[in-house]
Amino acid sequence: MAEVSMGSSSSSTDLSPEEERVFIRDIAIAAEANSKEGDTFYLITQRWWQEWIEYVNQDQPCNTNDGSSLSEHCDSPGSSTLKKPSRIDNSDLIYDSSLEDPSNTSEIIETLQEGRDYVLLPQEVWNQLRSWYGGGPTLARRVISSGLSQTELAVEVYPLRLQLLLMPKSDHSAIRISKKETIRELHRRACEIFDLDSEHVRIWDYYGHQKYSLMNDLDKTLDDANLQMDQDILVEVLDINGTLSSAHIQSAQENGLVDGDSTSILIEPSKSSLAAAGGFSSSRNAFRTGSVEVSQSFDNTYSSTGVTTRGSTAGLTGLLNLGNTCFMNSAIQCLVHTPEFASYFQEDYHQEINWQNPLGMVGELALAFGDLLRKLWAPGRTPIAPRPFKAKLARFAPQFSGYNQHDSQELLAFLLDGLHEDLNRVKHKPYINSRDADGRPDEEVADEFWKNHIARNDSIIVDVCQGQYKSTLVCPICNKVSVTFDPFMYLSLPLQFNTTRAITVTVFSCDKTALPSTITVNVSKQGRCRDLIQALTNACSLKQSEELKLAEIRNNFIHRLFEDPLIPLSSIKDDDHLAAYKLSKSSENTTLLRLVLRRRDQKAGERESTVQLKPCGTPLLSSASCGDALTKGKIHCLVQNMLSPFRREESVGKKGNSDSSIPERRSARFNNTEEEDKVGGLKKAKKSNSSDLGASKLSLQLIDEDNKTINLPDNEAEAMKLPSSATVTIYLDWTPELSGMYDITCLESLPEVLKYGPTTKKARSEPLSLYACLEAFLREEPLVPDEMWFCPQCNERRQASKKLDLWRLPEVLVIHLKRFSYSRSMKHKLETFVNFPIHDLDLTKYVANKNLSQPQLYELYALTNHYGGMGSGHYTAHIKLLDDSRWYNFDDSHISHINEDDVKSGAAYVLFYRRKSDAGGKMT
């Protein structure tokens, strides 16, 4: 490996790709080793980072989506010679990229996922890359401490955004502040923003527009105060007597900030201990309340979900989404509606809390879950805000802190394990030395293993959810057989791997009479841009004289052209909008012409002179030779040719009515279908006659690549040559007259690369059986090389074959469908539709213990669903209430009836089955 030593001032143009890689690798290693609280990290778009990684590596593809460290990627071999990356462009990470925020507080898009959308770089690495490549905007974020011991470090990508409401002036302001700042700092900043005297100001936790608690513990952090993203903070200004004046109260009443018969007073804490949010305490001080001042009416501050039910059915209370917490809400609802847990946590379970268990959370997690369960089963339909529970969860599992989307199954696994340890009836776990089977009967060995397990693990979670499987290992050399019987909490079943993905592209033709069409093609998930272009070429029957230019459309502009055929398709997101333009094959001296439409954006009351022109619709693309002499009239003809497919019928054009409501306009929308589909309703245009609209009627502005204006000749016949730049942007001001002649409704929005929705009938016609998934899970297979077994007879590690069998099944069987797949080169989600039984899941033949006399039958009562892609999307739950035998959809705070036929879908993720009773086949 070549050693490189140079100052930070070195230009990247002086370095080879290998030297850049080594230089950044060494900086990254040093920075990661010395990271500490208070350091600054910087977000960089995953797309640019991926380009740079591939540029500086030489042997094979490299992808950063594997969770490994930054320095590891700088040691990953790459592939063929690639084009040097252009300027860093982080515009896809923020809402408004028109201006760079000099304070480095640009609003980052809320749904970003690390490793999918961005990479975090230490300050030293960011500074070096930016000095080489330039660009931005700069997105700096602080390192904070997290976890129970506050020793785990994390980058606070999304600081709290709080809405400050000033009473009585009814002013408001939004601020960003770290959750590690104190209430004192929040108080100071509120006074600074509203220009207030701090001695006469107090602030309230005003979550849900109710006074939840007075924030008077100035040294408490905002994290400890359980503040949530985008919640309200009430800022009260008091008079010299410490109260609001009558005039102020009247003003506040008019704005709904206080009740009509009240003044601003301290709200009394809840008198209920166990029913309040974190109100239990013991002589051991094992449970510390998070907030003392709790409003009695807090849980009644939200409107009903509107569910109409028979009688007074309980259990139909929703959970408010605190910001990407649907993953948590769906899992909680399934556990809460498990009958055994509902009964247990509504009774006095506190005597079973294990206060000394070092593997537990000293009872805090169990208490928080039990309190939440009681509220969800209480009478009424008012949605609950699970703030106290989320705070406890984040404290003991920092990976679930913040407001990023997480895996619902990972949350479920942690929660079940945490509840088990908090409720473990075994106070002192004995040491047990497990014996080998040594040829003994399976029944004897299985019972021995189970008794040993129960001697250390005995809780309601074990009683309800844990089963036992038989694991058989066979040495391939000496044939030594090792049999163990291990407990399981859930079964993670593999799904068939799909190596392709569907990508939808809108194709624009160079034929002046052809309308745009949407085409969906299947390509390899690990493919390159050239593979997508080839698939589109085949699908749209491209002529020999034509070529496709593929582009990503964003904010009514061509955000990027996919000119490099080696760009990985993984850089194309499912919610991107792609366009492909059919053009005549170009020579080296061809200039691309981008036609961008822009419309006057006049707001109410705005003066005519200040009205701005804003881009609209989808850009169009054409080409022209740099050597051709073009007149102003020819340029206008080029523009009219690009617009000709959207020309209205002559009768409509003559009327010039821009507000036409003909059916053709109303139906001119793209449909995301599985085959080529012409835009409905628009008539194919007749051959365009450029004389229909004189050149003087088109308002054009030409801009070159350097953002410099290209002056058009005043004389229409005077010839000009296009500059040698690769692209020229033509801005066309869209006028009412043009609207009367052309219908560009279909250009207003393009379909996304992949639209998620209910499973199609085609997908349902050939489903994957849940039994097939189970058989794949139980199938004998060799261990992977990284997990080789130590054979006691050979006294060496061997790649043994492993066979799993079910032996003991739990009362509640949780089945996880492994939709998310991870590898070093990629992450992806499997959209496979799995046909799972609802009423009679029969596992009898899969249980190796043949001494069981009863059939092993289960009935589905709950499941979680995931809609969307990796690291994003949305979770819901389908749950059957056993007391009324009806199915409901739990979508955060909204609950609605669903038919049993709608329970199955391609979104099903975690299934909850309950054992049927012996008599009658019904669940107990």
UniProtKB/Swiss-Prot annotation:
CDD domains for this protein: Peptidase_C19R
Keyword set includes Electron transport: no
Superkingdom as given in the UniProt entry: Eukaryota
Domain DUSP: 15-145
Comp. bias regions, Basic and acidic residues: 648-667
Keywords assigned: Hydrolase, Protease, Thiol protease, Ubl conjugation pathway
An annotated Gene Ontology molecular function: cysteine-type deubiquitinase activity
GO biological processes: protein deubiquitination; ubiquitin-dependent protein catabolic process
Entry-linked SUPFAM superfamilies: Cysteine proteinases, DUSP-like
InterPro entries (alphabetical): DUSP-like_sf, Papain-like_cys_pep_sf, Pept_C19_DUSP, Peptidase_C19_UCH, Ub_carboxyl-term_hydrolase, USP_CS, USP_dom
Region (Disordered): 64-87, 648-690
Function: Recognizes and hydrolyzes the peptide bond at the C-terminal Gly of ubiquitin. Involved in the processing of poly-ubiquitin precursors as well as that of ubiquitinated proteins.
Family: Belongs to the peptidase C19 family.
Alphabetical list of PANTHER family matching this protein: UBIQUITIN CARBOXYL-TERMINAL HYDROLASE (PTHR21646), UBIQUITIN CARBOXYL-TERMINAL HYDROLASE 5 (PTHR21646:SF18)
Protein's name in the database: Ubiquitin carboxyl-terminal hydrolase 5
Organism (species): Arabidopsis thaliana (Mouse-ear cress)
Gene name of this polypeptide: UBP5
